């Protein structure tokens, strides 16, 4: 080698911890195969939970990630479970793979978490959302509004029956901006 090319050199961000922003969160965790997400979690004061088989790709071990999240929820007030697979499929421009990863997210992560926590004595809220769009036709991140779902015991559903970018804009929350989503979720 005759040169070194550092990727994304930077500095520590000046940001409050999650507990400083949301005092009801005394202890929280992040589960991700993506170093950037783990780093943000670290600066937000969340402990990193390493999961065997977490790849950040479509072959990630959903079951181990779900098991780790459910175990953490027994002691932590907040768990951020990040699954990168559909984003990577978007970067590859592979619509069939993207559909498979979304189906896997639904059947191997969201569904099992919901089934596990829906009757817990201590109520648990669930949010499902991408961190950004990655359309297959563009193969890069875009800045359109993203769909999201919030569930907690007793919440009344709105009229939206489809989980996509268009339908979500017509949901009871409408289009949220900046930090409105996390503030709404953490109420």
Regions found by a protein language model. Name each.
Residues 1-187:
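Feature captures the catalytic ectodomains and active-site-proximal regions of enzymes
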């Amino acid at each position: 080698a005759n040169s070194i090319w550092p990727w994304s050199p930077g500095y520590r961000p000046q940001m409050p911890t999650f507990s400083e922003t949301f005092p009801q969160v005394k202890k929280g965790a992040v589960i991700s195969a993506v170093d950037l997400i783990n780093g943000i979690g670290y600066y937000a004061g969340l402990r990193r939970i390493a999961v065997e088989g977490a790849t950040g790709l479509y072959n990630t071990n959903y079951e181990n990630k779900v098991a780790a999240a459910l175990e953490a929820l027994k002691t932590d007030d907040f768990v951020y479970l990040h699954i990168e697979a559909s984003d990577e499929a978007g970067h590859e421009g592979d619509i069939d793979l993207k559909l498979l990863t979304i189906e896997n997210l639904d059947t191997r992560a969201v569904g099992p978490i919901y089934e596990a926590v829906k009757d817990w004595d201590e109520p648990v809220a669930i949010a499902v959302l991408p961190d950004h769009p990655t359309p297959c036709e563009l193969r890069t991140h875009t800045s359109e509004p993203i769909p999201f779902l919030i569930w907690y015991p007793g919440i009344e559903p709105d009229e939206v029956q489809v989980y996509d970018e268009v339908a979500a804009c017509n949901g009871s929350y409408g289009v949220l901006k900046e930090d409105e989503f996390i503030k709404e979720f953490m109420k």
